Amino acid sequence: MLKREMNIADYDAELWQAMEQEKVRQEEHIELIASENYTSPRVMQAQGSQLTNKYAEGYPGKRYYGGCEYVDVVEQLAIDRAKELFGADYANVQPHSGSQANFAVYTALLQPGDTVLGMNLAQGGHLTHGSPVNFSGKLYNIVPYGIDESGKIDYDEMAKLAKEHKPKMIIGGFSAYSGVVDWAKMREIADSIGAYLFVDMAHVAGLIAAGVYPNPVPHAHVVTTTTHKTLAGPRGGLILAKGGDEELYKKLNSAVFPSAQGGPLMHVIAGKAVALKEAMEPEFKVYQQQVAKNAKAMVEVFLNRGYKVVSGGTENHLFLLDLVDKNLTGKEADAALGRANITVNKNSVPNDPKSPFVTSGIRIGSPAVTRRGFKEAEVKELAGWMCDVLDNINDEATIERVKAKVLDICARFPVYA
C-alpha cells in the first residue's frame, strides 16, 4: 500500500545522496550555461504531483482514455496561456523537448530529402537545424547559412542561397548567437521562394515573452521553443503558430501525436502552465530586462580585460568568448572555471581551428545568475574573477582564491532562499 510518508531518503540512500549532492552543487556553483535556469518551487510542485499517474493520449476533449476531465483542464490552461503570452492562435504543449517539437515541425511540413536552409552549427545554429549527426541532417538536404565578418547573420547570403537552392523550409533561431534576428527579413526571403519560415526561439523565449527581444510569432509559419532556458519552466517543448491555417494546425498536432509521441507528460504540462503564468507577471519582465543588462555588463569586463567577444557584444542573454588569440581551448577554459565552481560550456567559434570536442571558445549566459538576484555589480565582479582564472589557467592558487569568492557570493545569493 502506498503511504504519503514514503520517501527516497529512507528507501534509497545511494540515489538520495546523489540528489542531495546535486542540490548542493547548484547552490555552491555559479551557473553560466546559457541554456540552463532554475525553476520555481511551484513548477517543481506540479512536476511532483499525482498528474504523473495519468495517461492522456490525444488532446483536450478528444482523448483515447477515460478519466481525463481534470487533465484536460490542466492542458487547456497551458495552451491558452501559451497563446496569450506569445500572441499565437495555435499552441501544442505536449512535446517532451525542444528537439521533439522541432522533429514534429519537420515531419508536418516536409518529406525526407526536401531541402532546408538552416544556420550552420559552427556559427551559432543548433543540432536540429541540420547537423549531420542529427535526424535533421540525416533525413533532409541541408544548406547552411552563416554569419558575416562582423558576427551578424548574413541575410544577403541567406537570400542568395535561398534563390539558388529553393529550400522548402528556412529555419531561424540559434543556440549560440548573441545578436537580434530580423524575423521580418527572414519571412521576406522565405516568401520570395515560397518556402516555410520555421523559427526555433528556444534560447530567447523568456526575453520575447517579456518584450525584451522581437517576437517571431507574427512572422513565422511555425515557432517552437523549449520551456526551460530563459522561460525558466520545466524541461519540455512547445509549438506555436498564428494565421488561422487550420490545416497546418492539424498537421502539427498529428506530427506530435500519434506520429512522434504517445501519452503526454501531464505533470510536466502542469509545470509548463505554472511557468507560463509566472511569465505573465510584472516581475518576470523586470527579470528578463536584468538578464539582458547583466550579459552586456559581463561583455564590457571581458573586452576591457583584452578578451575577444564574438560579434563584439551581445543583444540578448548570451555571448561567446573567442580564446584563439589567448592560445587556450574551450575545453581547458571550461575545466579551469569548473574547478573554481563556475560552470560554462566549451563552444565552437567562427572559423574554429579545433574540433567540436575541444573548441576554441566558451559560451556564457546570464539567465541563471540573474535568477539568483545578481545585478550588474555582481556579474562584473564575476567576469573579473573569470578573467583571473583564464589569465592564470595553470595556477591552482588563483583558482582556489576565486573559488572562495564564488562560495561567498553563492551564500549571499542562494538559488532557493
From Swiss-Prot:
Gene giving rise to this polypeptide: glyA
What family, per the record?
Belongs to the SHMT family.
In Swiss-Prot or TrEMBL terms, this protein is called Serine hydroxymethyltransferase
Which terms does the record give in the GO molecular function aspect?
Answer: glycine hydroxymethyltransferase activity; pyridoxal phosphate binding
Gene Ontology cellular component terms for the protein in this record: cytoplasm; cytosol
Q: How does it assemble?
A: Homodimer.
List GO BP terms, alphabetically: glycine biosynthetic process from serine; tetrahydrofolate interconversion; tetrahydrofolate metabolic process
Domain of life assignment: Bacteria
Q: Which reaction does it catalyse?
A: (6R)-5,10-methylene-5,6,7,8-tetrahydrofolate + glycine + H2O = (6S)-5,6,7,8-tetrahydrofolate + L-serine
Please spell out the taxonomic lineage of the organism that makes this protein. Answer: Bacteria, Pseudomonadati, Pseudomonadota, Gammaproteobacteria, Enterobacterales
Where N6-(pyridoxal phosphate)lysine occurs, the residues are K229
Where is this chain primarily localised? cytoplasm
Query: Which CDD domains does the protein's record reference?
Result: SHMT (cd00378)
Stated EC number for the protein is 2.1.2.1
UniProt site (Plays an important role in substrate specificity): H228
Q: Which organism is it from?
A: Salmonella typhimurium (strain LT2 / SGSC1412 / ATCC 700720)
Q: Which pathway does it take part in?
A: One-carbon metabolism; tetrahydrofolate interconversion; Amino-acid biosynthesis; glycine biosynthesis; glycine from L-serine: step 1/1
- Do you know which Gene3D superfamilies this protein is assigned to? Aspartate Aminotransferase, domain 1 (3.90.1150.10), Type I PLP-dependent aspartate aminotransferase-like (Major domain) (3.40.640.10)
